């Protein structure tokens, strides 16, 4: 039984050893712009950046290819290998391509000068950095115009809609602010009038209380004056009776 399991055991050990010692190739990532718009006679920089787990060496290769619009033909316009850039010396890009990248900085950019209508198409950047050889290339589409590229209908409609919505928001905000100010003023005026009314009512109540309290005082004063007159009359009568007796 154990003899039958020995080959399977050896196979598993060999697989584990291979995974632990041998490092599989990693995928390389390449990035470019998506769309570029230029005018006739101008220059364009085709950016190509890449990322790899491996160090850049002389084994690193980079290439640029071009496919014109409405065509399936693919034209090689640039190649980098063994640490040296190679620019194609024939075809429509002859004398117009310049290497401006730096492989050590993961930059594979080129410049195409004096653009023309025949340069409309898709440019593809492909990078290999062994053992990172698995990955996808990146494309950038170039459109060459006679003048400044016109603004798209979508951009114009978006700007109009955005402006219209902004005006509506400003109007609504202004109305809410106006209503808030009016309500605040009305509340302040109402509270002021209420304070005045309460003050007037308090003044009336205090005036009535003063008139009511003066009644007993007046009656007491009258009583005192009457009692004083009666006492003086009694005294005068007593003095007259004494005189008559004498």
Curated annotation (Swiss-Prot):
<keyword id="KW-0732">Signal</keyword>
<feature type="topological domain" description="Extracellular">
    <location>
        <begin position="28"/>
        <end position="150"/>
    </location>
</feature>
<keyword id="KW-0597">Phosphoprotein</keyword>
<dbReference type="InterPro" id="IPR036179">
    <property type="entry name" value="Ig-like_dom_sf"/>
</dbReference>
<dbReference type="InterPro" id="IPR013783">
    <property type="entry name" value="Ig-like_fold"/>
</dbReference>
<dbReference type="InterPro" id="IPR019738">
    <property type="entry name" value="Myelin_P0_CS"/>
</dbReference>
<feature type="compositionally biased region" description="Basic and acidic residues">
    <location>
        <begin position="231"/>
        <end position="246"/>
    </location>
</feature>
<keyword id="KW-0812">Transmembrane</keyword>
<dbReference type="InterPro" id="IPR019566">
    <property type="entry name" value="MYP0_C"/>
</dbReference>
<dbReference type="GO" id="GO:0005886">
    <property type="term" value="C:plasma membrane"/>
</dbReference>
<feature type="domain" description="Ig-like V-type">
    <location>
        <begin position="28"/>
        <end position="143"/>
    </location>
</feature>
<protein>
    <recommendedName>
        <fullName>Myelin protein P0</fullName>
    </recommendedName>
</protein>
<feature type="region of interest" description="Disordered">
    <location>
        <begin position="200"/>
        <end position="246"/>
    </location>
</feature>
<dbReference type="GO" id="GO:0042552">
    <property type="term" value="P:myelination"/>
</dbReference>
<dbReference type="InterPro" id="IPR003599">
    <property type="entry name" value="Ig_sub"/>
</dbReference>
<feature type="glycosylation site" description="N-linked (GlcNAc...) (complex) asparagine">
    <location>
        <position position="120"/>
    </location>
</feature>
<dbReference type="Pfam" id="PF07686">
    <property type="entry name" value="V-set"/>
</dbReference>
<keyword id="KW-1003">Cell membrane</keyword>
<keyword id="KW-1015">Disulfide bond</keyword>
<keyword id="KW-0472">Membrane</keyword>
<feature type="signal peptide">
    <location>
        <begin position="1"/>
        <end position="27"/>
    </location>
</feature>
<feature type="disulfide bond">
    <location>
        <begin position="48"/>
        <end position="125"/>
    </location>
</feature>
<comment type="function">
    <text>Creation of an extracellular membrane face which guides the wrapping process and ultimately compacts adjacent lamellae.</text>
</comment>
<dbReference type="Pfam" id="PF10570">
    <property type="entry name" value="Myelin-PO_C"/>
</dbReference>
<feature type="transmembrane region" description="Helical">
    <location>
        <begin position="151"/>
        <end position="178"/>
    </location>
</feature>
<dbReference type="InterPro" id="IPR007110">
    <property type="entry name" value="Ig-like_dom"/>
</dbReference>
<dbReference type="InterPro" id="IPR000920">
    <property type="entry name" value="Myelin_P0-rel"/>
</dbReference>
<feature type="topological domain" description="Cytoplasmic">
    <location>
        <begin position="179"/>
        <end position="246"/>
    </location>
</feature>
<keyword id="KW-1133">Transmembrane helix</keyword>
<comment type="similarity">
    <text>Belongs to the myelin P0 protein family.</text>
</comment>
<dbReference type="InterPro" id="IPR013106">
    <property type="entry name" value="Ig_V-set"/>
</dbReference>
<keyword id="KW-0393">Immunoglobulin domain</keyword>
<keyword id="KW-0325">Glycoprotein</keyword>
